[in-house]
Swiss-Prot record:
Keyword terms of this UniProt record: Bacterial flagellum biogenesis, Chaperone, Cytoplasm, Translation regulation
GO BP: bacterial-type flagellum assembly; regulation of translation
Official protein name in the record: Flagellar assembly factor FliW
Organism encoding this protein: Desulfovibrio desulfuricans (strain ATCC 27774 / DSM 6949 / MB)
Gene this chain is encoded by: fliW
Gene3D superfamilies: BH3618-like
Keyword DNA repair among UniProt keywords: no
Family label: Belongs to the FliW family.
Keyword Chaperone carried by entry: yes
Length: 166
């Protein structure tokens, strides 16, 4: 049985040992970080809805992300994707991928944390390829987390198949 290759990287959370097989490649990079192509998802705490999408090459580049379906019904947010994006991700439907959104927490104002719905990050967990898919909709661009009730408490939402985190 083959063992996963562990590698050491410096992160925003300190030095971490990560599974090299869980690295996600972003062929186009991310908005503002176009030259950063390889990332890994790191748990902040077990069972916490927030993760760090950490650059493999730059310890300063780590984005706070969340599964939006932990905070809202799946029917309330469906990012639009074109055929080119689906082809690049090697999926035929959004249901085959994990959807993450960046989280903004203003300094000193954790109660004003917001989910950024305008630039979802879509990851094909099986192929380990990801893409940020900017949205051009008239819908809300962000939703403040204090106005949301975690979906897990109501048990009504379908959870997306989140990409495994380290």
């Amino acid at each position: 049985m083959a063992r996963n290759k562990e590698i050491e990287i410096d992160t925003r959370l300190g030095r971490r040992s990560v599974d090299a097989d869980k690295v996600v490649h972003f062929p186009r990079g991310l908005a503002g970080f176009e030259n950063e192509r390889d990332f890994i998802l790191l748990q902040i705490r077990p069972e916490a809805p927030l993760l760090i999408l950490q650059s493999m090459s730059n310890p300063v580049v780590g984005l706070l992300v969340a599964d939006p379906y932990s905070f809202m019904e799946k029917s309330a947010y469906a990012p639009a994707m074109g055929e080119a994006e689906k082809q690049l991700l090697r999926i035929s439907d959004l249901d085959e991928a994990a959807v993450l959104v960046t989280v903004t927490i203003p300094a000193g104002q954790p109660g004003e944390a917001a989910l950024n719905l305008a630039g979802p990050i879509v990851i094909n967990s099986r192929e380990r390829v990801g893409l940020q898919v900017p949205q051009c909709s008239d819908g809300p661009q962000q939703i403040y987390m204090h106005s949301l009730k975690p979906v897990g408490e109501s048990g009504q939402a379908e959870k997306s198949e989140a990409a495994p985190a380290e």
